[in-house]
């Protein structure tokens, strides 16, 4: 009788799937220019970074840059990968053995010792700037007394209160204002 409809549809869909895969494989790749090219390179290369031109090889002295290849011709993933930079070795890369220092290196800690003479010269230089009166013990005491006196002068009260009661024998003092008269 013939082929059932279900099987024929299944075969048709299978054929279309294979045909679309083959067409996609042989069709020319898309072109990338400008910002799209840079974004795609950043996505493909990631942390490695990328170059716009490959190092010149001996075989092909005139190598085209990625802009010339991807913008004017077709560009695919394999071509983009060739422009990715090689990753630099990280500090945690333990695949290579660390360099061994020679054993004859001195093991003494590097310490800058206190130099008394330099300290003494700097204090003498400071003392030369001070007046002779302030360098003596008596002079320093006079300066402290002078500072205490000035501090007391700065904090004196605004109103001097009398020590005695101004009213004689408890008599009340009545002030008459000039407005009432």
UniProtKB/Swiss-Prot annotation:
Sugar-modified residues: 163
Localization terms from the record: Secreted
GO CC terms in record: extracellular space
Disulfide cross-links: 33-71, 45-84, 70-75
Positions of region (C): 53-64
Annotated region (A), positions in chain: 65-85
Signal peptide span: 1-24
Function recorded in the entry: The insulin-like growth factors possess growth-promoting activity. Major fetal growth hormone in mammals. Plays a key role in regulating fetoplacental development. IGF2 is influenced by placental lactogen. Also involved in tissue differentiation. In adults, involved in glucose metabolism in adipose tissue, skeletal muscle and liver. Acts as a ligand for integrin which is required for IGF2 signaling. Positively regulates myogenic transcription factor MYOD1 function by facilitating the recruitment of transcriptional coactivators, thereby controlling muscle terminal differentiation.
PANTHER family linked: INSULIN-LIKE GROWTH FACTOR II
Membership in a protein family: Belongs to the insulin family.
Protein name: Insulin-like growth factor 2
Organism name: Equus caballus
Gene, per the UniProt record: IGF2
